[in-house]
Each structure stands twice: as C-alpha cells, then as structure tokens.
Amino acid sequence: MQKFKMVNHSKWVEMLGMKYWGFLLTMFSLMVLPAGILAEVGVDSRKIVLGTHQPLSGPMKNYAQIGRGASIYFQYLNDQGGIHGRQLFLLQRDDRFKPQRTLKLVEELVMKDRVFALFSGIGTETSESAMPLLKSQGVPHFFIGSNARRITEPPRHGIFSMLPTPEVEARVLGQYVNSNHPGEKVILWFRDEPEYKAASKEIAQKLQGNPLQFLPSKAGSSQFKAEWEAIQAGNPRAVIAIGPYAPLIKFLRAADVSGTPIYTGNALADSNLWRMLDSRIINRLRVLTSFPLLIESNHPGIRLHRALLREYAPDFKPSRWSIYGHSVAELMAEVLRRSGRDLTREGAIRSAENLKSWRGKLMPPVYLDRNQHLSMSFLRVSRIMPTKVVHLSEWLDGR
C-alpha cells in the first residue's frame, strides 16, 4: 500500500507568503532601480557626468576656452532645471596636447571617475590615442575637436567629430565658385599635403566646367611671393586657397591688395581677421563660416553668449573659442535631451545619429546618421569686415 507524505500546512503557507513578498520586492526594485542603482555608468537620478581632455596649459592653452565656454552653457542649463531633471557636470583634464598624457587621463576619467561619455576632446592624435580604450569599455566620444577625415571616415561606433574636414570645405567652395564664376578660369593654391591634395580633387570635381589651374605649394616652402607672381601670370577670375592655418595666413599676407576674389576655408572665420591681414586683402577674401562671429552683435546666439558670460564668468572675455565651446555644448545637450530620461550610452548614440538638419542658437544645420558622424558639414560663404559679416550664400551642404 502506497504511503503518502504529510505536508506541514503552516510551513506551506509560510513558503507561499515568502514567494509572494519576494515577487513584490523584485517588482518594486525593477520600478525604482533604473533611476539609481541600475542606471547607466555616469548617470544617476540627479546628474550626468561627462569628461573631456583639453590643453588647459602649454602652447595650445587658448583652446582651453572651448571647455570653459561649454561649462558655462551647462551651468546655465542646470539653472534652468538641467536635462530631464538631471544636472550636467563636465570633468576637464589637462592633457597639454600630448597623446600619451591624454591616454592616461582618459583612463582615469573612464575607470576611476566613471564618466558617462567623453565630450569635445581637443585634437586628432590626442583623441585617437584613447580610442582603443573607449571601444573596449563601450564609452562614446561625442564631437571631437578635429577636422581630420580619418576620425569619422569610415564611421566608428560612438565616435563623432565636430569640425569640417578639408574635403567638406572643398565641396562647398567648389559648389559656390561653380555657381558664381561659370566658365571662368580659376587657380587653386593648396598646400601639398595629403588632406589638401584630396580636397583639391573634390574642388576639381565641382569645377569641371571651369578652366582650372593647380598651384601646389610644397610643405615647408615659404616662396609665397613667387606663387602670387605665378597666379598673376595665370590671369584667373577667382583664386581658391586651402591649407593649414599658419602657411595659409603667410600666403595671404603676400597677396597684392587688389585683384580677383580669393576663396578660402573655415580656419579664417574669425572676428579678429582684420588684425591678421591688411584690410585691403580682406576685401578680396571670401571665407567659409559656421558659427556666428562676435561682431554679429544682433545675432540671437551671440546675444545669449555674451549674456551668459556676463552672468557666470564676468572675467572671461568672449572669443571665437568660447563661442565654439557654447556651440558644441548646445549640440551635446540636444543629444541628451532627445535620449530621454532613461539615458544610456547606446541611446545617446542613436539620438545623435538621428539629428536631421537640427539647428541650435549658435550651431549651423547639423545632419547626422549611421554613416555620417561629422557634425559640421553645412557652411556659408561670407565676407568678414571690421564691424559686420555679409553672408553671400545660404547654408551649403558639403557632405
């Protein structure tokens, strides 16, 4: 005859009760913890922590104004309630523009300070030095301060750049010159370096209907007077000049004070241009612009920028680089805003990749997707005068 084991009724009831309360505790944890303990690294219910590497000291310390401009804008946002109720904190580290130092500091930001993301690190080699670490830890780097094509082409997951590449600038310049000098002879001066050789090909592609003469300037050469003599002998109706900032300025200083228009890139988009070049040469210049310039005093973004500096940093003189910092912070804030309250690194990357022709108070139109990780691809052709800027074109797409 089969024997049946007697069940302790009170123990069975107790066990069911424990399971019931355990179930309730689990459900409660799932509802509460995502805003705190289970949140993404660098995020809790009250704050988002970003990190950046900047040359806060040394010969490149002027770029430190970018980080300060960004911090001021974040402080302003925090006083408005932050992003989805969270305050923004930016941890700035001084890498002195040295890649080995950058890697050490980024490792501390990621492993010790546990930042949500890197934001607006300055420099190509400096930023590249930390990319293997960021990839291994799943940390994105939003809006690197570099104009190097290799940062975003081909696109890398979680890596976004800020500044227009020489190729982007070349497409815009070629597009504008083709429209405004149809069939006319153009001479293209460019520094004989890989990125500017590639850019010269982009210009040639846009100017297939124009007689085009190439004038490469050897790296390290300072024969700028002779180069201008060759340009004059060629008798062009327009000159395009592209190259790194330092040799480009020296080349322009050697130009005659009168002559055909000279088209150049975004490097010279500065309110202080009149201090660098003879005003008569500036009259010949057509420059690619992105952010509004300080002399555009009636621009809403410039008015806001000056007001924020008066409020939060009265000792801080506004500059091209403080505007840059404000602008890139505005872009970062938009990405975080679109990511929602349940903020994750992957969610922020997706939000960045879905910015379609977005514009801020200072930023030009931004178009990003999975294959386009370069933020500034829309530029305008402008004339910069001592007291005003005249925009000669609408926003032109350099993608």
Regions found by a protein language model. Name each.
Residues 38-52, 82-87, 178-184:
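Immediate post-signal peptide segment of exported/extracytoplasmic ligand-binding proteins
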Residues 149-150, 157-258, 294-303:
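Extracellular/periplasmic Venus flytrap/periplasmic-binding protein
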Residues 49, 62-68, 80-153, 217-224, ...:
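Beta-alpha junction/loop-to-helix N-cap segments that form part of ligand/metal-binding clefts
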Residues 109, 113-122, 142-144, 185-190, ...:
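Periplasmic-binding protein-like
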Residues 209, 252-326, 385, 394-398:
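Extracellular/periplasmic periplasmic-binding protein-like sensory domains
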Residues 311-323, 333-388:
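Segments of small-molecule ligand-sensing domains
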Residues 42-47, 51-71, 93-99, 122-123, ...:
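Extracytoplasmic "Venus flytrap"
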